[in-house]
Amino acid sequence: PDTSLSAGEIENYFATYVIEQSAVDLGGIRNTVTVTGRSPNSSTNDISDISDDGDDDDGNTENDPTDIPITRSPALTVNKTAAVVEGSGNSITDLGDTINYTITVQNTGNVTLTGVTIVDDLENADGDNLTLTSGPDWSIADNGSSEGTLKVGETATYYASYLIEASGSDSGSIVNTAIITASSPVGTNDTTASSSVTTTTTEDPSIVVVKTYNIIENGVSGTNPNDIVQYQIAVTNTGNVTLSSINYVDTFTNRESI
């Protein structure tokens, strides 16, 4: 470049900078130029000036850096899916099956997110709390970040599971909600998102009754008057839901009326 400058002359210089993520995270770019020169009667660089930003209305009329503000927009998206693994030996979703949950969390903003945490709420259709069998456990981030950090555009995957118990199947459905919270350069825990998925269970109520007896003899061999007949009634819930208001009606007749 030309290193001389005539009186009244303006020389333009150009420089470029590719915006890096660290600059976005900090909210802007600050640039200052210092120009030095030598006057005709000097053997050293005796003239210098620090650049101004060209804005005399900002409260600083001299030697102020040129600032380029960058708007920081933290954001998250969460997606949750559920897949049922048959465990009860039938073709319906019910007691004994396992629900496997996959939760993906993506940084859809323009700043790095840290302190990423997940809270996974599990309830039945009545609003009663249920307990996950496992998870939620962090698995991987697709751009190499460790657990708790998400680069811009990066997606992390979590897994959880629930073995369906009576408290889950009796109500007719199971609702799972993942709530993600993260911190951005703008603030602590300032970025949240959530996603829910509902799994419907199928009721298949049934009952089996088996009645057996035992004769207690009164001292005389064989079945005779005054012997005692002791009945045992076994009632088995062979369905997949809890049964209530069980009622017993025992009809007793002699053989001639059978």
Task: Please identify what each model-predicted range represents.
Residues 1-258:
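Exported/extracytosolic protein signature
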